[in-house]
Design a protein with these regions (language model features):
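N-terminal signal-anchor transmembrane segment
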Residues: 3, 7, 23-124, 155-157, ...
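Transmembrane alpha-helices of multi-pass inner-membrane enzymes
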Residues: 36-39, 256, 420, 436-451, ...
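Alpha-helical transmembrane segments of multi-pass inner-membrane proteins
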Residues: 37-40, 62, 150-154, 158, ...
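Aromatic-anchored transmembrane helix interface
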Residues: 104-114, 141-153, 165-190, 204
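A membrane-periplasm/extracellular boundary helix in multi-pass inner-membrane enzymes
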Residues: 217-220, 284-285, 305-346, 361-365, ...
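Flexible juxtamembrane loops connecting transmembrane helices in multi-pass membrane enzymes
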Residues: 231-238, 329-359, 379-382
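Hydrophobic transmembrane alpha-helices and their immediate junctions
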Residues: 311-315, 319, 408-447
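Long extracytoplasmic/lumenal interhelical loops at the membrane interface
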Residues: 346-358, 365-366, 370-409
């Protein structure tokens, strides 16, 4: 359903009302076209090694939003793009030529970030409708649970004797994890005019991010020569911001948004088909957890979509495409089996997960109240993660949210997480009969994958999670 993207001027933007380009700028910002442009910029920066130039443009766009935007909603797509921007050639863990090292561009990136933050602070201080006391007083129903969760993170390892064993890293990691959950929710809840937001805006942000990563999968296959001797070598599926599991996670999370958008356009079958193709790209990440989540979440999203009889034709077309792909898979069973040999050989092999889960529970039994800290002492988890985990400031993680919480923070951390999760579950239930259900499904995909991986303790997916909660809580959706 088409919705107006024009908003009345606020006191802040009234001063620019007579400038025609500012009005056109705001119309662009509130439309899906802006998300498309940001996504294209991210693809170009990632595939062609132009990250520094792309970051510069993204920051300039962000400053344009901070200074001239009616609100800060368009920054959502910029935040996601900044995370998924780095390409293979700039992975700081694989090359010393990465732009993220100070001598190669790291200082410049920090300057860009500082400039963006300064403009954000300026807007919050000067704009009394979105900033100032109004910002602080905006209702944030999920905030209490997030603060409780943050306290649980910061107490992880207290009284275990390991809290400061790695210096301030344990506290710093806990703080970063808390900010990942809290910061975007806190900022956007107070800086967006939610009564004027089009209800499909986050769906466009999510779909843009998902398709961007799909393009990156193609780039990774070419750049890293992933296929040799007609076989996919899964260890080569890595980009500048994450490995195969990270890429698969982002794509799987965004599949519900393709289904959501299918009823908002007369070309709904296009979006439904995109959802099916995103499942295919998830398969080419060879991330087993992501593949499982992508298929399950697509099926559930499709079942919800079938409630609307207007969507059924589009979904029939999309599922016909899926059926055709399955038929082709059967016809070319031999070559496809060879192509995915490594994935098929893994099957349901836990690959040491069963070992580290047992060790994680033993760590919990040894430190039941506050856990051991985010920096494990047992050897098995480093064997699972790889040797590099012992040489980085980032801790090895337990690849299961519950065990991570118990081993790192004990029953206190798990209880704090439960408070936050109960609040989000209530929100999901409240929105279950509206189009907000697709945001709930995206978040559910993240939580399901995090039962076999460490995505809830990776910043990128959780930044989107934080924004999604703000959007879900505040927007009025169609039922």
């Amino acid at each position: 359903m088409a919705q107006s993207v024009l908003q009345p001027n606020t006191e802040w933007t009234a001063r620019f009302a007579h400038i025609s380009w500012v009005q056109r700028w705001n119309s662009l910002l509130q439309s899906p076209l802006f998300v498309v442009l940001v996504s294209l910029l991210t693809v170009i920066g990632n595939l062609f090694g132009l990250e520094l130039a792309a970051y510069t443009v993204l920051v300039l766009l962000g400053i344009g939003v901070f200074l001239f935007g009616r609100d800060l909603l368009p920054v959502m797509s910029i935040v996601v793009s900044c995370y998924i921007m780095p390409g293979v050639h700039n992975n700081p863990g694989r090359t010393e030529e990465s732009i993220f090292y100070p001598q190669n561009g790291g200082i410049y990136i920090l300057i860009l970030a500082g400039l963006a933050v300064a403009c954000l602070v300026y807007r919050l201080v000067r704009d009394q409708e979105l900033g100032g006391k109004a910002f602080l007083k905006r209702p944030r129903k999920l905030l209490p649970g997030m603060l409780v969760l943050g306290a649980g993170y910061l107490l992880s390892g207290a009284f275990s004797g390991r809290y400061f064993e790695n210096g301030i890293y344990n506290m710093a990691f806990a703080l970063v994890q808390f900010l990942s959950v809290f910061l975007m929710y806190w900022i956007f809840s107070g800086t967006v005019r939610w009564d004027r937001v089009r209800s499909d805006y986050l769906a466009w942000v999510g779909l843009g991010a998902g398709l961007t990563v799909c393009c990156q999968v193609i780039g990774v296959y070419i750049e890293n020569q992933v296929i040799t001797e007609k076989t996919i070598h899964t260890g080569l599926i890595t980009t500048g911001w994450g490995n195969a599991n990270n890429m698969g996670c982002i794509i799987a999370m965004m599949i519900p948004f393709a289904v959501d958008l299918s009823h908002r356009s007369k070309y709904g079958w296009v979006y439904s088909t995109i959802g099916v193709l995103m499942i295919g790209f998830t398969c080419f990440t060879c991330s087993r957890t992501s593949i499982m989540a992508a298929v399950l979440i697509y099926i559930v999203a499709m079942l919800f979509a079938l409630r609307d009889p207007r969507r059924r034709k589009d979904l029939i077309i999309a599922n016909s495409v899926l059926l055709a792909l399955l038929v082709l898979l059967l016809i070319f069973h031999g070559p496809m089996s060879q192509l995915f040999t490594e994935l098929l050989e893994r099957g349901f092999n836990p690959r040491l997960r069963d070992v580290i889960y047992v060790d994680g529970m033993q760590v919990f039994r040894d430190n039941p109240i506050f856990g051991e800290s985010f920096y494990p002492s047992v050897d098995s988890i480093y064997q699972f993660s790889n040797v590099a985990a012992m040489q980085t400031i980032l801790p090895a993680r337990w690849h299961n949210t519950v065990i991570q919480l118990l081993a790192s923070g004990g029953v206190v951390s798990l209880a704090c997480y439960a408070v936050h999760r109960v609040q989000t579950a209530k929100l999901f239930w409240k929105k279950r009969k509206s189009d907000g259900i697709y945001i709930s499904l995206s978040v559910t995909a993240l939580l399901v994958m995090s039962l076999l991986d460490c995505h809830f303790f990776n910043d990128g997916p959780v930044l989107f999670y934080s924004m999604a909660l703000a959007f879900l809580e505040n927007v009025k959706f169609n039922k």
